[in-house]
């Protein structure tokens, strides 16, 4: 009777058994992945962790007519489950009292009165009478209750639109969103779950001198930017508008909402890769101390030694101290004998088959279609190419390339005929660089703005025609530029000059890739979507369930980037040519960012490399048929769109249902007005008034987070791990006749080339970085996969997701088939590197393939 009274009524009480899967705090310690989980901490948990079910059908007048709570149930014995659990997880039994009136539980409250936090993965009620199994996907850290201002609540895996939420659960749904939003004040702590916005005012460190001051990005017309996650750290002493920074040694502790932090396997992999790369970086440095030219590679053999010979492990007290300080798990990883030992970098794909094919014109051009930055090339639509820069400020910036420069290489066509036949293309790095070039060249960088013209040959490959290199006029910006045009040559010093011209282009493309294609267009633009989704869409919302996997680890990797990569004096500034102007440049480029244009078909049409064509499979027809990124990308895009269409159509049948969804409307409003607030007045934002607008927007969000990021990230080491192929910096200008540099170029062209591009120190640092960024961690979740098979209770979306997975498997087979087709010369090229960057799945490590669900590295 007492129990009956507790849960409402005097009916016979029954027992409902459940299984709780959790992980204790120090099971996640990367130094002890295999640690036993049945230790005293968990033994003590039993009576210190309580669960209370919340009824979705029986109200409690004493609780404001919200769902009735069951009496508390506590963790019981350790269970041996039939399904194997992941490393570090443990299952426990829990038994609830239940009666008929209580009905179906829609949520539960958990209270942790233990001193430690733990990771709660799931609760499954095995057999609720008249209902069967009820599953709660949790995947959340639960801290001691005194850390929270409100109860920790988890909902069952049945999605509901706001208007369809059971009445007794609505207040819980609303309150949980209020908790996640916070009140916009205070410094965030490790246990907080609050999602909020801030500008990029934390890149500089003005307290450490003028050289460490950086412009705030976001919140101004001059430097607009997507918002980042708010940490609430106090301002710097010298500038109240700049946020103070945490010490480098505490970088891993930078605030992100607790459940956004890397999981234990990822953190272990990440730290191991970082340590491994650092050691690889340090050892050649020690070696270079005994070299006559310590910051120079003297020959290409010198560069190749990084991958082939390696350096013998030094013995002695220093090495012993180093190994003693490294945890055992890490030592096993560092000293593996599978060709990736600590003493050398893995051989990048671009030089695996041939050590020299990267230098060919064909490979130079092919990488614009199938390399790590295949999203810049566009069709030439006016000749000579014109600039869009303001002539009042920058004078005449139009190209000086003439028909005489290129017509002898157009297979008998005139320039007009070649353009009309869609045969001329351009890699244009002129307008984006000119406003900053004068300042960039005051640093150790010495480089040019560039335009590269290419001709589409009958065999489907591209041929470089001319490279224009431009410098700001010495008398001032308003006088325009001084330009010089270079054309291909394979004879004598002209051949060496042509190789250098291509290197300057590669430097530009490398910087634009890292700052724009990679950081801005994937990492930075997606973070506001992560924040808004958690603030405005309940975990019960179907669109939250759709998008959630595509936000995994993004806030954490971006926070770490702000701490050690893109900050003043960080690794990015140290390794890319724009140096301290890098992030400011990306803000200027963000002015032209258009959300609907991030959709792959729209992007291809905008760049002129495709035309709209309703009779083509994906609604567009490629003008370069053998364009590996676009061909594979359109297949992936269509698969994502088909899946999103099936999913959204299940929940929304009319415009009215979209318009009356208050969470969805609040989400979209906040994204436009706050998350991407510097662009809130742009006319191109979808209104979010129709199911089609929702489908298109969600498809684009998923595309950016998954396939676009994979295409521009995981090819970094395969193509740029060998720095001569994609140098990040140029240190001197093109040699002029009559100078010692020109004589050196004639006598020792390789040495002159290496003295022009990235120096040894920068190379080692840059290669170390991109090796880390190009690796998949062992716990990666790929497109078409989910963390839990129980992510939703709705059968139709589950079936649609299964169909999506099968479609991606078919696409993998097609990619393998295309890569084996010798007619498609751009698929592998002279370096024999098959295009696999949009191959959906991968194993862990440095694979050059695989599309993770999210921007997770």
Curated annotation (Swiss-Prot):
pH dependence: Optimum pH is 5.5-7.0.
Record-level Gene Ontology MF annotations: linoleate 9S-lipoxygenase activity; metal ion binding; oxidoreductase activity, acting on single donors with incorporation of molecular oxygen, incorporation of two atoms of oxygen
Organism, as annotated: Solanum tuberosum
Subcellular localization, as worded in the UniProt entry: Cytoplasm
Family: Belongs to the lipoxygenase family.
Cofactor entry: Fe cation
Residue span(s) of domain PLAT: 26-156
EC number(s) given by UniProt: 1.13.11.58
Protein name according to UniProt: Linoleate 9S-lipoxygenase 6
